[in-house]
């Protein structure tokens, strides 16, 4: 029973890290990256549809994303969805494809994006701490219900803390790497 609590905590902390990793992938670092468009939803025949399911996305140049819709009639819908997103990019629609030119980042904008990375990291660490808190409560309940001894509870709490520290360290490392990528451009 007690190992289930630890295993569940590890799984949930890893999920928090995965969510953070996917959020980091959508942060613009001044270079074209197809994952920038992962969260863009297009209103397609009245149904919100992920852009990546509606179009091929290629990178013909280091700072250009080219979006080729599978259905040419959705070109304007895709353009509107990109404009409505929080990407801060202006699409160029030539009637067949949409080009997104990723502008060079100014020093000020780099700092803003680095702060955003920090904010995302803090949200991920809060999620990890919430998982830790749930695991600790579960261990206390197990001890109270007589499922585990007090010594076992302390040992397992230390293990939960160790997993929490490892997860937090991993998040910090990912944030530092992304900040370096952004600052160096």
From Swiss-Prot:
Name-wise, this protein is: Ribosome-recycling factor
**SUPFAM superfamilies for the chain:** Ribosome recycling factor, RRF
Q: Which Pfam families match?
A: RRF (PF01765)
Assigned protein family = Belongs to the RRF family.
Q: Name a biological process GO annotation.
A: translational termination
Region of interest called Disordered, as start-end residue ranges on this chain: 138-185
Where does the protein end up? Answer: Cytoplasm
Enumerate the UniProt keywords alphabetically: Cytoplasm, Protein biosynthesis
| Record carries keyword Protein biosynthesis | yes
The GO molecular function terms of this record are: ribosomal large subunit binding
């Amino acid at each position: 029973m007690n190992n289930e609590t630890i295993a569940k905590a590890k799984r949930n902390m890893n999920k928090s890290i995965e969510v953070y990793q996917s959020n980091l992938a959508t942060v613009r670092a001044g270079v074209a990256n197809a994952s920038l468009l992962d969260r863009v939803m297009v209103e397609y025949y009245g149904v919100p549809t992920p852009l990546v399911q509606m179009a091929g996305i290629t990178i013909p140049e280091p700072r250009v994303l080219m979006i080729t819709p599978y259905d040419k009639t959705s070109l304007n819908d895709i353009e509107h969805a990109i404009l409505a997103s929080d990407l801060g990019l202006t699409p160029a629609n030539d009637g067949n494809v949409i080009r997104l030119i990723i502008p060079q980042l100014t020093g000020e904008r780099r700092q803003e994006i680095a702060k955003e990375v920090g904010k995302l990291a803090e949200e991920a660490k809060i999620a990890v701490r919430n998982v830790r808190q749930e695991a600790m409560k579960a261990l206390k309940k197990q001890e109270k219900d007589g499922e585990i001894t007090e010594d076992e509870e302390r040992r397992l709490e230390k293990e939960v803390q160790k997993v929490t520290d490892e997860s937090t360290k991993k998040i910090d490392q990912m944030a530092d790497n992304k900040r370096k990528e952004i600052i160096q451009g």
